């Protein structure tokens, strides 16, 4: 690495040396020398020495069974440690300017000052700032929670080590602690022995709140308020909740048979239990702090004249109620009878006494105390409520259709699934307006239908404050939305949970505005939504369906159409972005991603999924979380107050041509090429990925299905493992080359320089090209793929090369990642450590498949370690 990153290089070197010491102590210096030889050969091969590349392959393919797991683990652990050092560097006091995001709120304030925005416009936008992060347990978080805790402790040690006046003794103690942690990690099994349950996944989400976000959220709001006040004279209302968190863990049952109504109920209770326990700690600490005896008349009238410590009198009662609530929740979770006397069931019960104390402190001139812990607790309440995380419910549209189909057949009125859309809507609206029950009391539905009904009953019996929205995956028609609302009505849901269609395929995205227009034309529906409509935009499945370019353009144009339609109907539209960390799933840095959205699309707030390993990278440490939230807040405010101009018509025409041709090229390979599926299955670890205990959800929607039933996440994950990265670029090269050949290069460069959407798209390609490696993919092919399929592999690799060349020809400086030199440097650092894992993985896949049905535990374990290591090295893999 260059001198510019010397502090980061120093930390990477330190952690690497300590890892080497741990490995040498365990397996001996001779083994450590072998690891060093592999490392040096890989670096030399990366630098262009083909002879060393051959020697590296020879060395890795001739490892004994006893060496397979330790070699894989050595490189995987180094990459994990490099990730820790890099994450720490982003919040370090020695962070290089090219690595650390400049303070985004300060930068934004400068832009606002140079604009024609009025104080009122800015204040209104600040008041309306709303960001909702939806945490999901998609199966990409490779690292075990046990190791994550050790990684956090390593980060803490690095933080203490950079204190300038640390004594030699303190430094030695910290280095000793670092060595202990790295040695503990080395001697800990990297791979989960069994799949996590949905409840386990939910607890992982709770831990992220407890360990990081509980501290980060009030600090973020404090920083935001301070910057806005000092820079623009803007205030943040006390009741403001610019950030909230929701979860899919325990609520997302789309294709996951393990998420049952019972599981959802348990997760809801567990979430509240964690929240109450955290508030109990806060209130206990606040009780210690608020020992003052001066209070205002409002507080005195509540506690009485004899209370010597009025604040403590209020807080002790609150503490007692929290203890009772915790005991009641514990009993319920253990299937015991609970005493529900004096328990807290709403945020209001907790907030009102705290507000009484807060205003009293203000009124008595104790502003510094009022602006301390009690304000932090109030802001936590605004963010987390009494439930910690709201829970979204997600279910496939087909399951609701099957429920109504079974019902109508029982009633003898036909088969709902066989009706056309008009007949479905007529039936649904008739029953939605009918006061008599539709479900017969003697009806005994099938187990699958009963599960749908039980889930809706859980929704009906849950405090609305604990729920987010109900999402319908693979939504295609207005009836898909009305069907959910009818089922909820029939199970007795007393409130109107927002119901959001999720448009996932290319056709469904293009048809989304027409579907919503039909719904907005229904009087009953307009009354139900009360002026607010949630719509979810699918990124991963649309890219898998049509290729990344066509999917991105459909996402953009569908959002434009939905924004326009909602404005015409005076409806507040909340777009929910189902993005991931990979390019094939919409992954891009927060600011770039948000500012490349259509103008006006963030007016209703930001709602976005944070998935898998990205939760840890963005929110795993309090300082990192504050940084991430600042970036999101600045981007949303900028997008709403200083939106990018709408694209010119000629840009749109070029983009449409790019989209159409890239979709055709993508589908030609994926759908029409007869060798594609067998090639995919043999050249990637797709089958083996199904064995890895990643998440609770199966990798396929239907166990017997082919590519079309494979979930988008394992589809992308498999291609990233062999470094072809196919979902992130396939289809783009040929279509872009056609545009260049038609003389549209000046127009494409104009789009790159002046249209954030197009600029971000090409920049994401640039990052993919730094991670992709045709030669490594070719090695997988030669080791694993039948020779008759090799010509297809060559065509795909040639296509990648063409795509890289055409993107380089299009961008003005003709070099990859010139605007993001740190990302380029980071990838260059990792590649020599990821490459041996790829070569070893190909060898392990070969050995595993040669064994047939015979299980070889050593080979399988080593294979799983390489999968984890490559994921760590590539970072945004799922």
Swiss-Prot record:
Keywords: Carbon dioxide fixation, Lyase, Magnesium. The keyword Lyase applies. It comes from the Bacteria. It catalyses: oxaloacetate + phosphate = phosphoenolpyruvate + hydrogencarbonate. GO terms for cellular component: cytosol. It is an enzyme of class 4 (lyase). Signal peptide: none annotated. Its EC number is 4.1.1.31. Its cofactor is Mg(2+). GO terms for molecular function: magnesium ion binding; phosphoenolpyruvate carboxylase activity. PROSITE patterns: PEPCASE_1 (PS00781), PEPCASE_2 (PS00393). The active site is at 138, 544. Pfam families: PEPcase. GO terms for biological process: carbon fixation; oxaloacetate metabolic process; tricarboxylic acid cycle. Forms oxaloacetate, a four-carbon dicarboxylic acid source for the tricarboxylic acid cycle. Belongs to the PEPCase type 1 family. This is Phosphoenolpyruvate carboxylase. It comes from Psychromonas ingrahamii (strain DSM 17664 / CCUG 51855 / 37).
